[in-house]
């Protein structure tokens, strides 16, 4: 980018969440997680089209911390093998770190159902107790009505999940 040209860039094919805190100093951020390679071929090659949200393949993180200092991160991710034939669905995944963010567990897909739901904009409670509590928006068509592919307006559900922290052990 050229700061003085007044333009901007958007890289929708990027994948991954990074974590950094003040204790890292000048060290690089740590890779947390990204979209899962669901067909285990080493690449994300089954993505037909990414629904436009103004974000990347894995995005919209939200964090919570438990009494032991473990960090939990939820995020929305394109699901490689779950498509309506035009666009891939997004599900909500959660990962955790108990060492200050140096390492992270394998992300767990916490989306109930078959996965053929568009799940976006998760918001996790800041304080995690025996459960991770989060809410997210769900409908059954990838994308949005207000921008991007301009899907038809449909009723969206706001879903609450309470996930036992023992699911991450």
Name what the model sees in each region.
Residues 1-169:
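Extracellular, repeat-based ectodomains that mediate carbohydrate processing or recognition
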